[in-house]
């Protein structure tokens, strides 16, 4: 049985405010493989209280996130969010592993399009549309990558 690769969640706001750098090489990248392994195992260890996770929450200043979706979760490399302005925004309560016990009221777009590279053998740029909770999670995690704390 393989050992779980779980990292401690970063709670220092000064570390979380640093914008993350893009992943350059998408294939045969040992650092990317390491980030994804730790991100996945750390998420699974916290999934009862976690809907997504950004690489900088576990100590990597790289643009990689994990977002829970209906069918499990998706790893997004270098994600870019394009909001659907026509559908507007909504304010809801959110919490965050990096700020245990705190609840924030955050206004987010109801629908978004995310452009990203998947973590696959053929990391071809993909575009997916998300609504509702998945859209909110995606925006929350990309905020982490941008050093935005709410």
Give, region by region, the residue ranges found by the protein language model:
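Positively charged
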Residues: 1-150
């Amino acid at each position: 049985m393989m050992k779980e690769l779980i990292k401690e969640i970063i709670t220092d706001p000064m570390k979380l405010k640093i914008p993350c750098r893009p992943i350059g090489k998408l294939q045969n990248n040992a650092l990317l493989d390491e980030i994804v392994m730790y991100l996945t195992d750390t998420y699974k260890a916290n999934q009862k209280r976690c809907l997504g996770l950004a690489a900088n929450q576990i100590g990597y200043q790289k643009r990689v996130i994990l977002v829970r979706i209906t069918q499990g979760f998706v790893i997004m490399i270098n994600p870019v969010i394009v909001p659907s302005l026509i559908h507007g925004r909504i304010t809801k309560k959110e919490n965050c592993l990096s700020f245990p016990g705190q609840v924030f009221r955050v206004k987010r777009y109801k629908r978004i399009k995310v452009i990203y590279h998947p973590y696959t053998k053929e990391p071809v740029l993909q575009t997916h549309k998300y609504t509702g909770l998945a859209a909110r999670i995606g925006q929350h995690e990309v905020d982490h990558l941008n050093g935005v704390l709410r």
